[in-house]
């Protein structure tokens, strides 16, 4: 006999699972309401911001630079990086860092969102990171305004909100970033990307040029990695 095998869930686990259900219900409501797409638009923009930060932070981790970040209201974004001296592998990893960025961020948010203290630390860390980005790398008006608003919301919720509010915010954002992995998956299988500055080879197309195999192969690799990371994050969140 193993007494703990069928024991009730701990209070933190019950709370976390309830928050996940609530976040899912809110998300469903956003998609069902006539104006839900408008209300959900900020989360599309958030996935863009996380994508571009994924490129920039990966470049920094691999010894490169992060010069500038721009994003626009249509959901497009670009990160200007210094990859001088990067070989093919480091260049490809920097590109992949943006493609898997939303999934990695979602998994991290799920992990920290299991507890109220973890959620508060997550919001504080994200708020400070975004403020640093605001000063150091964001270089267009829309990007500056959006990044500043997200940073302010994170810090305000962490410092003034209740523990439950912080936890709900982190879990809700994790759900939105997780959904963006699937709702924006078409970008993993396109050769051309566009923004107000023009049309350019997509991330997977440049990866193909660096590593020879076709762009769709690298789209599959990044997609599979994203799903695996998400699964890991949800499993930890669910208490397994």
Language-model features: where?
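N-terminal signal-anchor transmembrane alpha helix
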Residues: 10-56
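Small-residue-rich helix-interface/hinge motifs
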Residues: 36-91
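Residues in and immediately flanking transmembrane alpha helices
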Residues: 64-68, 111, 239
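Metalloprotease/metallohydrolase-associated module, dominated by Zn2+-dependent proteases
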Residues: 2-29, 74-238
């Amino acid at each position: 006999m193993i007494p703990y095998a069928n024991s009730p869930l701990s209070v933190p686990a019950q709370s976390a699972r309830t928050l996940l259900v609530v976040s899912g219900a809110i998300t469903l409501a956003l998609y069902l309401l006539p104006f839900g797409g408008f209300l959900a638009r900020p989360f599309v923009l958030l996935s863009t911001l996380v994508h571009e930060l994924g490129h920039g932070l990966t470049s920094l981790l691999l010894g490169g630079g992060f010069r500038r970040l721009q994003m626009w209201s249509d959901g497009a974004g670009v990160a200007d990086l210094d990859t001088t001296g990067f070989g093919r592998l480091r260049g490809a990893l920097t590109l992949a860092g943006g493609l898997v960025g939303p999934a990695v961020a979602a998994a991290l948010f799920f992990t920290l969102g299991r507890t109220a203290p973890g959620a508060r630390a997550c919001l504080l860390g994200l708020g400070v990171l975004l403020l640093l980005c605001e000063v150091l790398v964001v270089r267009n008006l829309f990007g500056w305004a959006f990044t500043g608003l997200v940073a302010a919301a994170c810090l305000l919720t962490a410092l003034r909100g209740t523990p439950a509010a912080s936890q709900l915010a982190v879990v809700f954002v994790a759900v939105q970033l997780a959904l963006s992995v699937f709702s924006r998956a078409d970008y993993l299988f396109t050769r051309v990307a566009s923004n107000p500055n023009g049309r350019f080879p997509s991330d997977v197309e440049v990866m193909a040029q660096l590593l020879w195999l076709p762009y769709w192969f690298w789209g599959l690799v990044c997609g599979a990695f994203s799903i695996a990371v998400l699964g890991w994050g949800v499993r930890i969140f669910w208490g397994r």
